[in-house]
Amino acid sequence: YDDLNKEKSSDKYEYIFPSFNISKDLESNLDGTLTFNNIGFNKLYDTNVNEKILVNNLSYESIDSINSIGLVNNYEIILKNFNSDSNNSNNYKNKKESDLQGLLQFNSKLPLRKIGKNFDSLLTPIFVAKFNPSSNRNIKNSDRIVDYNNIFSSNRLSSDETLEGGES
């Protein structure tokens, strides 16, 4: 499209090729859900800035298991393959790049219920342990918010490019 705010006539045009996001639940003999996800795009803007991104995700989420005291446990495993090929980009390295990351997350919760005369109360303490042997990308300039909606999510950074590094 034509950006009329650009001064140089050669920078006025931006080419955004179709992006894609394909997800497929894979059949498996595992007790849980195995999902493959593929994301990609190609952008050409400011005359000579080219960004090509391809991300492959393979994730597994086990079914919940409830033990004798009522703890509900499950785990998640994510393998992420990030590939980029960029020229003159401020967002990515100006070369071909490939990065493989993995994340293991254990979730446990104990649903509690207090029955009273006038009302019932519910409380569910949640315990989450994560481990990623890789370090994550520097995304401090990204607009990411961790709040109560995604605090226990395996991808709480909401990033297609990286997983949260280290352990927590």
Language-model segments: residues:
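Outer-membrane beta-barrel proteins and related beta-barrel translocases across Gram-negative bacteria
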Residues: 1-168
